[in-house]
Amino acid sequence: MIQTETRLKVADNSGARELLVIRVMGGSKRKTGNIGDIVVAAVKQATPGGVVKKGDVVKAVIVRTKSGARREDGSYIKFDENAAVIINADKSPRGTRIFGPVARELREGDFMKIVSLAPEVL
C-alpha cells in the first residue's frame, strides 16, 4: 500500500534514485495505491548527469511493494522494498533499463514495455 509521503526507490536508469509520492492517481478520494498504479512524485535524490533532476515532479508506476498484492488464485506476492519506474505521458519508461524483478500485474495495465525490459517477471 503506497500512500502520500511514501518514499519509493527508483527501479530504472532515468537518473532519479528516490521519489516522494505526492498523489495516487485515480480519483479525488483515492488514498492508497498498489502494484500497477500510477503516482505523481517528486524526485528527492538524483544522480548527476541523469535525465531527471532533484526537485522534478514526475509520474511513476509502482512495480514492487512491501505490503504485497493479492492475485486471482488467492496467493500473495511481496517484495523487500517499495519501488517505481518513472514513465512518460504515453506510459513508456523514461529510462532504458529496469533493475530488479517486477510483478506480473503490470501486464494488465498497458506497461508491456516495462515488462519486456525487466530482467525478471514474478
Curated annotation (Swiss-Prot):
InterPro entries: Ribosomal_uL14 (IPR000218), Ribosomal_uL14_bac-type (IPR005745), Ribosomal_uL14_CS (IPR019972), Ribosomal_uL14_sf (IPR036853). GO terms for cellular component: cytosolic large ribosomal subunit. Transmembrane segments: none annotated. One of its GO terms (molecular function) is large ribosomal subunit rRNA binding. The keyword rRNA-binding applies. One of its GO terms (biological process) is translation. The keyword Translocase does not apply. PROSITE patterns: RIBOSOMAL_L14. It holds the Pfam family Ribosomal_L14. Keywords: Ribonucleoprotein, Ribosomal protein, RNA-binding, rRNA-binding. HAMAP family: Ribosomal_uL14. Belongs to the universal ribosomal protein uL14 family. Part of the 50S ribosomal subunit. Forms a cluster with proteins L3 and L19. In the 70S ribosome, L14 and L19 interact and together make contacts with the 16S rRNA in bridges B5 and B8. Binds to 23S rRNA. Forms part of two intersubunit bridges in the 70S ribosome. This is Large ribosomal subunit protein uL14. The gene is rplN.
